[in-house]
Amino acid sequence: MQTHNNVDPQEIAKFEKMAATWWDPEGEFKPLHNLNPLRLNYIDQIAGGIFGKQVLDVGCGGGILSESMAKIGAQVTGLDMGDEPLDVARLHAIETGVLINYVKNTAEAHRDEHRGQYDVVTCMEMLEHVPNPSSVIQACADMVKPGGFVFFSTINRNIRAYVETILGAEYLLKMLPVGTHDHNKFIKPSELIDLADKAELFCSDAVGITYNPITDIFRYTKSLEVNYMIATVKND
């Protein structure tokens, strides 16, 4: 097996430090808990239902998305490089009686033995935390079956995104620990779609996510100016 090093140790350490609160709906990962129903619905709707399908969740962390997909019948493999988040994910799956295969590995290394294996691959809120996003995108493309779906979510790179996700969410509203995000690692939709296209993933849909701090509610929006998701299909 090849060795792949598309990992930022500082990013891994950052999320390992917060792992103990991963499943606290009022803790540091509250935004992910509130956002997850929108992510799950989008994935399930666009993919034509994930019940009974082989799904790979790249950058699964403590398993919020992985577990929700398994609960609606997907056969889920969760992939991450953080020991503590994976331990939390495995323990919570046992507590809730959900079967999920959690694996410590990079997307690139996992690809070596899993080419064309998955019906659906998800890579949510992960690309902005790795040194080489294009390498992860290519690995995701290699692991999905022809005609299968790969979903990505990340944050746009512009002034508004900086104000809302860093100044607003981290410093003002204290929704996230300071230092969670680096604006320089954010990815414009045009850049993400171009990288996906180079990996032979056709962008079939895109949607934005907006947050109202007054109502504490996330909702879909046509605007991709800040948080957004794209759905891509592997060319046959």
Swiss-Prot record:
One Pfam family recorded for the sequence: Methyltransf_23
Chain residues that bind S-adenosyl-L-methionine: R39, G59, D80, M124
Entry keyword annotation includes Secreted: no
GO molecular function: 2-polyprenyl-6-hydroxyphenol methylase activity; 3-demethylubiquinol 3-O-methyltransferase activity; polyprenyldihydroxybenzoate methyltransferase activity
Keyword annotations from UniProtKB, A to Z: Methyltransferase, S-adenosyl-L-methionine, Transferase, Ubiquinone biosynthesis
Source organism of the structure: Shewanella halifaxensis (strain HAW-EB4)
Function: O-methyltransferase that catalyzes the 2 O-methylation steps in the ubiquinone biosynthetic pathway.
Protein name (Swiss-Prot/TrEMBL): Ubiquinone biosynthesis O-methyltransferase
